Amino acid sequence: MWSSIAAFPVLVPVALACLGYEGGVPTPTAHHSNSAVIEVAAGQVFDAGWAKYDRGSGACKGQSEGDWKDAVFYLHSGATLKNVIIGANQAEGVHCDGPCTLQFVWFEDVCEDAITIKNDKAGQETWIIGGGAYHASDKIVQHNGCGTVNIINFYAEDYGKVPRSCGNCDKQCKRNVYVEGTTARNGGEVVGINLNYGDTATLKNVCADSAHPCVFYDGCAGDCEPKKVGYCSG
């Protein structure tokens, strides 16, 4: 069953507006396979013009944890990536070192994580606007920093979680996530946050077929496994 959710803290939408594009991954204008990560300098904009980028055949190693050097794009603080398709041949999609902006970034087949955000501080915001991701067996967005992640008009299909607050980072903190106008099909929970660290999640005008779109975890620090402890209200 499809539902529109307003979850912790509760926000009741005036009108439904699930605006994630459901027409599939855009047709690429070109295809580039690179042997090394592409870095986007702090504050700069990389407009791919709807080209597809990947790291070449065999790059994906399943759920083996990688780092920024394994990514297709590495965005420094304040950088923007837009109008791009991340191909299936990659271990990590996009890494952000600090807050970043992604506009119309599509992932045709997620390997480990599509988007990893780290080193953002409380009060800093990352924006993921439009775009979407397919076939993420675990997370689409992994948030390791301490700021706010805003996900607007995104599309997710066949996924484990859309955003997830880091469950076992060495240094833990409060994190915030805001999801609006997003469509999520054939997946698990839309949002996973750590109740014990004071995380907040707001879901507004989200269309999902998940039984429990927002899930609380008891996070931990280091070599440990977070535990699911309940469901966000809404």
Swiss-Prot record:
Lineage: superkingdom: Eukaryota
Localisation per UniProt entry: Secreted
Signal peptide: 1-17
Gene Ontology biological process terms in this record: cell wall organization; pectin catabolic process
Organism: Aspergillus fumigatus (strain ATCC MYA-4609 / CBS 101355 / FGSC A1100 / Af293) (Neosartorya fumigata)
Required co-factors: Ca(2+)
An example Gene Ontology CC term for this record: extracellular region
The EC number(s) this enzyme carries: 4.2.2.2
GO molecular function annotations of the record: pectate lyase activity
InterPro entries given in the database record: Pectate_lyase_PlyH/PlyE-like, Pectin_lyas_fold, Pectin_lyase_fold/virulence
Keywords carried by this UniProt record: Calcium, Carbohydrate metabolism, Cell wall biogenesis/degradation, Lyase, Polysaccharide degradation, Secreted, Signal
Free-text remark on how the cofactor is bound: Binds 1 Ca(2+) ion per subunit.
Protein name as it appears in the record: Probable pectate lyase F
